[in-house]
């Protein structure tokens, strides 16, 4: 009888031991002291949730949006499937008559950047904000119709955060009214450019503008790089993919070099600055600060994105920790149907300490991101009136918050993965690939350490202005407010006498404000009075930016709850969450609070005690709180974070889909295994089925 090697490996139909995951999660959900759906509506809005359901019903039945094979794909397969998704999305927008919100929801739910991502996220927004009316017709309108596909080429092989150090040049040629793009060195290669490797036929290229012999620094140009006829690179352009990366491998990040490549005058994006045809005379922007508004918007949206990253990671880890049972707690044995069973991992204090503050951080980032968008919109209105008073504080805070919150998210995703134990190491957890793809956030749109310098420069300048009486408290400038309060009493002490005093929002805000102000004051003293160089102060610079932004996160969370239109039960749960976030942050940063003299040793002990109390109070609401994030299983794509709790069944089903399990015998058997197994063996020692006989 011949052997059929094409029979896939299947698990026997058995049930997991112990209480079913579905029942365990149902038990957790029954503990909710608030209305989960109402909290979801408060966070997202009823209309947005309805649109998400509508879009989900469509894409979950679309082959191009199928995630089933995602964890088994090669890089080429991932890129190819990304193309299929992008093409089908364009078709669905027309077929379903989706608006911009619904289109964005479809991309959000698919949760994987694809080849066209940078066309939507960078190319089109730049064309909208930096072009003249003529250029909008020439570039933006066809881009919106996908008649041209673009990317944003700024970073180079030799320079990233130092934009002023970019080497690519764009020299104006008055005789032909053209610009000549050129890459003078190897390090001038544009590098890491998403969508450039194989997709884009146009690029926004940041190049040093040279006209009449003057180098005017980097400016944007809209440059055609590939033929619209056959997609081949144009003469004078060398372009390709940079190769496999730590993550983000569904996107064709690319490189490009220019060899005296001529482009027309209209390629220079001229909304804010102009080069006069024929003479090359340069007109600078009316206000250099105008470009800051776009940066604030991008960074505010990154903070909004952090809440989804934290929400996804904690939803998976908290649900799994409620289902996963390990050991029997002899001091407090868990019973199910009158039988002692193993304890859910989430009942262990250490697991609570690892996960619940991160749940709180997700909510903190929700409120802070929302507030940043509100302030951005307010600032746009004020700038139109010629009032730039809000811009400096908003720009500095958005820079620092981008740095702080994306670092928080990257660390939290990995912490949540580890909190899932051994199964967290499987891609099926939904956390490994997610972590890999999220990591670029800590370096793009400004390296996180370098961004803190922008924040710190503003903080130090503001401190000097407050000291000199040039800045007064304002509703919109919390930096001036806490610095003013600090200078009124630089020897202030924390008033806490019992652990529960730390639950007082005023106590919390005073502590965070004093700590931030103290750090700024000491840094200013070292730079201004002791002659310390900026480079020698970079560690402290990072600390004061971090302290300032932690103050903003805590304050925004607390103030938002004071103004929120929520019922008492929901407000009470969220207040516990806000307090946990604040006190856990204080505990992690204890050295700052102690060094400033604001906290004493006894108070730090009370602080630690109160953190544990808050963990106990938040624990029963853990699963309901992550359910309120309203993240569908399709989005999570996780065996461990399933809403029905059937994690073990999901793990085995995903293992069955592993391509290695599609056959019984591995393809390399004949070449690499059989020669060793058969060497020197005599067949009389083998049974008919190939088992080794026990007889000598």
Regions found by a protein language model. Give the residues of each.
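Flavin-dependent oxidoreductase catalytic core characteristic
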Residues: 1-696
